[in-house]
Amino acid sequence: MKTYWISLYLEISSQDNLKKYGEKAVPIIKSYGGKPVVRGGKLKSFSGPNVVRTVIWEFPTYDDAISCHESTDYKSAWTYAEDTTKRMMFIVEGLEH
């Protein structure tokens, strides 16, 4: 069942670090079957914390998304942005159609 990796960025203090993270992370995420659905774009928040950037990836399965996030390669990529980025991140299984 398709699964979604949702990242809500609350603060980004270094666009350079975020770019380096993206350069490393995107090929890793794609290697697990991830396909970008949302990467930035217009955002209007109606409740909750202010979100400055939203990223959503679609994965073939829940296990693929979890395996990607828990992989050594992905964790290594995240080190580029973790100290200059505050985000909330969720992995959510979609509906079966």
Name every feature range the model reports, one short phrase each.
Residues 1-54, 59-70, 93-97:
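Short S/T/G/P-rich N-terminal loop/turn motif that feeds into the first structured element of a domain
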Residues 65-90:
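C-terminal structural segments of small proteins and small subunits
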